[in-house]
Amino acid sequence: MRLMHPLDPARLADWQIAAALEPGLKPIGQVARDFGLEDREIIPMGPLVAKIDPVPLFARLTQPRGRYIDVTAINPTPLGEGKTTTILGLVQGLGAMGLSVSGAIRQPSSGPTFNLKGSAAGGGLAQCLPLAPFSLGLTGDIDCVTNANNLAMVA
């Protein structure tokens, strides 16, 4: 017997699941406070996205550190489950066990945005939200890296 989730990935596209879940997301300031970060330690990039300012965080380097799981490479399945889906699944699973957990994933390249490879945002019920800002540049850092590389090539 298969358990049915109201947002069944077998019946709905990833974007439909994201659109249904995004209105219920916590504001990024609340997420940061839940992890013990102060407002001065984050740089909001809209209501749902922020960067963590490394300067005020240096004072925390003397505190005990948690555990770390590094997902560096994986052979994607035929359904496209790769590193991002694995990381998001780990975060969701450990969170369901009552652990305080976060995940860090790299910003996707523009290839997924233009449907040239996987979405790089996970999929189904294990995807990165908010989906559109994540897929379309998030904080703009990837554009800065691209421009720096282009400048280095012509200089």
Language model regions located:
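Flexible phosphate-sensing "switch/lid" loops adjacent to ATP/NTP-binding sites
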Residues: 1-155
